[in-house]
Amino acid sequence: MLVLSRKLNQSIQIGDDIEVKIISIEGDQVKIGIEAPKHIDIHRKEVYLSIQEENNRAASLSVDLLSQLSSQKK
């Protein structure tokens, strides 16, 4: 993992298209701004993990449903 230090209003450039900027620092909370192309999804980690979990559940349910439908046609 790369660890970088930044101060207020400083930024980090990721590739040609993504900039992460420190917007404010209040106590133990840091607000960041992210400029990236529209086609790049950006989520908080806990939201991303929740989306992945839901997608896995949906995929599993689809396989189970297909199995049930397949056995009903026989």
From Swiss-Prot:
Alphabetic keyword roster: Bacterial flagellum biogenesis, Cytoplasm, Repressor, RNA-binding, Translation regulation
Assembly, per entry: Homodimer; the beta-strands of each monomer intercalate to form a hydrophobic core, while the alpha-helices form wings that extend away from the core.
Signal peptide: none
Gene Ontology terms describing biological process: bacterial-type flagellum organization; mRNA catabolic process; negative regulation of translational initiation; regulation of bacterial-type flagellum assembly; regulation of carbohydrate metabolic process
Main location: cytoplasm
Record's keyword annotation contains NAD: no
Protein name: Translational regulator CsrA
Coiled-coil zones: none
Gene responsible for this protein: csrA
Gene3D superfamilies named in the record: Translational regulator CsrA
Molecular function in Gene Ontology: mRNA 5'-UTR binding
Keyword RNA-binding in annotation: yes
Function comment: A translational regulator that binds mRNA to regulate translation initiation and/or mRNA stability. Usually binds in the 5'-UTR at or near the Shine-Dalgarno sequence preventing ribosome-binding, thus repressing translation. Its main target seems to be the major flagellin gene, while its function is anatagonized by FliW.
Cellular component annotations (GO), alphabetically ordered: cytosol
SUPFAM superfamilies the UniProt entry points to: CsrA-like
Family: Belongs to the CsrA/RsmA family.
Species name: Bacillus pumilus (strain SAFR-032)
Cell compartment(s), UniProt: Cytoplasm
